[in-house]
């Protein structure tokens, strides 16, 4: 198959403001816009660096140097279900290539899926059950493909009772097997059988141009990987996405713009419609400079809370952190307002519980649990205290109001969803009582462990950004409270330090949820004690803290045997998990991962908004951001 055309991009001068221009020698090339009408085009910032292998579209091969969030997995790929981290258009779960939910037998050892009829691949070939069967069997037979290990571990057999039905027999019961085909950020994409079966080696096939089930096809791309242009299919109505409407833009451009400042400038100048992420300071600047631009919230704190929970992780295999009184003491040494200001300049959405405060979780978990949290008692060994402060969100709002004025919400519900419901009180007296009860003593201002050695450790953190700021700040707060903590930058924290256990404490995350569904399965199954590696050996994702408890295993086993669609049962399990995590404090939850995504409404309107129509996630490298295109309308 021939390679699709590439367009050589000229070096462009980029306007840096009124009356000045800077020759952008070090910036990736901008896409040529002369051949595509601006009023029919949406231009989106791709957060990936320019692709090192730009013509590679075989998304099933990891580490190939091709792009993923360059439009490939948003506009071209498709699978059985999508789960939005927010409200969704008709609920957060989308039956995409499937016509309805997965159908399991009584013991969850078999799963049947009914498929949409009339869906066409972009080359006109009909999508059928044979494509799903081929995808699974090819993945299993091809180690090195992204989903090979998961399918091989779980699928005993797959057959197609008819052209639009797929039946799986599983190797062991699993009420969440369908989640492999459920997109949160990405998922197990369906392969076009008629294309790949003709390849001698499917792993070395570049899949250029990609043949997809989505409503767009490749128009052109930069040979240096800086931009990709996609064109709407004439037969877009033969895709599953057509159920939610016609995507409005005829063309979609994804641009890699590594410089945060350059992203800001391009949006101010009208050359960018959606930004994946800015720094907090960049977002504040955009709000002042571009009246047609905004973030997820209409005013401060602007950012979209992702269903990811930045936290302080303790290595539970380290004796320093094996007593929950010590972990609780460390939590009570921290000032949540200082954390918010240091990490996000006040734009953090704090969480006292082991759940990101985003999507439907605020209604399913945070609001209903407020009374329990307010009345929660902690025995310090000397006294009983109620450590939860439900006014933290309001206090942060008041703290930033002098600077940001009317941009800061005043409605209590809006404050809770923007800044969080509450957090733990800074209580050095209670922290000291807990440490004393655990056998610690104090020498001057320094806490000593039961063996007489200074209580000191290192906290590993990111190289930059809000996570680095968080790590640096908590280290300073603990040091001021008498625990000598040093923040240490770990450039490959998720690749090396966390899985290898070569850390004492860290700022990172081990909880990621669906966001739009109360089910915990996206992260919690990996927390089962059966997956915990011995000290010195590599830990599989995501239980980086290596914490185990029989009560946690029992919760995980309940999740495995509970129907995904049973909302109330899954909320009950979630509450059980949250309360256990509060009691034991194996990690200190801090906040959601707030992404300063932005959009401009000069060319397109109809974007989702937190306060009025939160139908989709505006963080545009997520595959489910594609639904936004069906709701857009030309601004003029």
Predicted regions and their residues:
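Extracellular/periplasmic solute-recognition and catalytic clefts
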Residues: 139, 146, 157-158, 219-231, ...
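N-terminal lobe/hinge region of extracytoplasmic solute-binding protein
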Residues: 43-106, 137, 211
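Aromatic- and charge-enriched surface segment that lines or borders ligand/interaction sites
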Residues: 100-145, 161, 167-169, 266, ...
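A short beta-strand/turn structural motif
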Residues: 53, 57-64, 70, 74, ...
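Aromatic-rich, solvent-exposed beta-strand/loop patch
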Residues: 100-103, 122, 169-191, 210-262, ...
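Surface-exposed binding/hinge segments that line
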Residues: 35, 114, 148-198, 215-217, ...
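Gly/Pro-rich hinge or "lid" segments in bacterial periplasmic/extracellular proteins
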Residues: 74-88, 184-247, 251, 261-262, ...
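Detector for C-terminal structural segments
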Residues: 26-27, 33-36, 46-50, 71-72, ...
């Amino acid at each position: 198959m021939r390679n699709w055309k590439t367009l050589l991009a000229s070096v462009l001068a980029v306007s840096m403001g009124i009356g000045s221009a800077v020759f952008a020698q070090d910036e990736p090339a901008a896409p040529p816009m002369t051949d595509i009408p601006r009023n029919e085009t949406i231009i989106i910032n791709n957060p990936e660096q320019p692709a090192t292998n730009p013509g590679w579209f075989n998304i099933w091969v990891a580490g190939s140097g091709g792009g993923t969030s360059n439009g490939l997995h948003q506009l071209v790929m498709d699978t059985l279900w999508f789960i939005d981290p927010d409200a969704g258009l008709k609920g957060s779960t989308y039956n995409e290539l499937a016509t309805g939910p997965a159908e399991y037998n009584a013991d969850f050892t078999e799963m049947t899926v009914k498929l949409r009829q009339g869906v066409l691949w972009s080359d006109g070939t009909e999508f059928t059950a044979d494509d799903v069967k081929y995808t699974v069997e090819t993945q299993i037979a091809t180690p090195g493909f992204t989903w090979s290990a998961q399918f091989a571990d779980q699928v005993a057999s797959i057959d197609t009772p008819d052209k639009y039905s797929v039946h799986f027999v599983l190797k062991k019961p699993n009420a969440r097997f369908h989640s492999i085909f459920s997109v949160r950020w990405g998922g197990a994409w369906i392969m076009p059988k008629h294309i790949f079966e003709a390849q001698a080696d499917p792993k070395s096939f570049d899949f250029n141009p990609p043949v997809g089930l989505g409503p767009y096809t490749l128009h052109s791309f930069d040979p240096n990987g800086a931009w990709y242009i996609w064109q709407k299919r004439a037969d877009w109505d033969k895709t599953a996405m057509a159920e939610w409407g016609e995507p409005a833009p005829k063309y979609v451009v994804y641009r890699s713009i590594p410089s945060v400042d350059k992203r800001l400038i391009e949006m101010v100048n009208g050359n960018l419609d959606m930004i994946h992420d800015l720094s907090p300071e960049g977002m504040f600047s955009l709000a002042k400079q571009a009246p047609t631009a905004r973030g997820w919230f209409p005013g401060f704190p602007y950012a979209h809370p992702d269903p990811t929970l930045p936290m302080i992780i303790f290595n539970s295999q380290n004796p320093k952190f094996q007593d929950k009184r010590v972990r609780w003491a460390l939590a009570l040494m921290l000032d949540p307002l200082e954390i918010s200001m240091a990490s996000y300049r006040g734009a953090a959405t704090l969480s006292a519980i082991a759940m990101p405060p985003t999507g439907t979780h605020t209604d399913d978990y945070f609001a209903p649990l407020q009374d329990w949290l307010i009345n929660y008692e902690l025995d310090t060994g000397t006294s009983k205290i109620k450590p939860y402060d439900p006014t933290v969100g309001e206090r942060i709002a008041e703290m930033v109001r002098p600077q940001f004025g009317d941009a800061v919400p005043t409605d209590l519900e809006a404050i809770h969803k923007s800044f969080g419901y509450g957090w733990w009180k800074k209580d050095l007296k209670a922290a000291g009582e807990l440490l004393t009860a655990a056998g610690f003593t104090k020498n001057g201002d320094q806490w000593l462990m039961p063996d007489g050695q200074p209580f000191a450790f290192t906290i590993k953190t990111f190289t930059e950004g809000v996570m680095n700021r968080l790590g640096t700040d908590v280290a300073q707060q603990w040091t001021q409270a008498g625990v000598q903590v040093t923040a240490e930058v770990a450039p490959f924290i998720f690749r090396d330090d966390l899985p290898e256990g070569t850390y004492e404490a860290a700022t990172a995350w081990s909880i990621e949820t669906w966001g739009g569904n109360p089910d915990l399965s996206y992260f919690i199954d990996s927390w089962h004690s059966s997956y915990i590696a011995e000290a010195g050996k590599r830990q599989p994702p995501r239980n980086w803290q290596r914490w185990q408890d029989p009560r946690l295993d029992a919760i995980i086993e309940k999740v495995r045997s509970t129907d995904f669609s049973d909302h109330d049962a899954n909320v009950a399990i979630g509450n059980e998990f949250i309360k256990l995590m509060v009691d034991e404090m194996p990690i200190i939850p801090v906040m959601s991962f707030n992404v300063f995504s932005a959009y401009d409404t000069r060319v397109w309107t109809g974007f989702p908004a937190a306060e009025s129509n939160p139908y989709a996630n505006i963080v545009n490298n997520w595959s489910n951001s594609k639904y936004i295109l069906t709701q857009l309308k030309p601004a003029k």
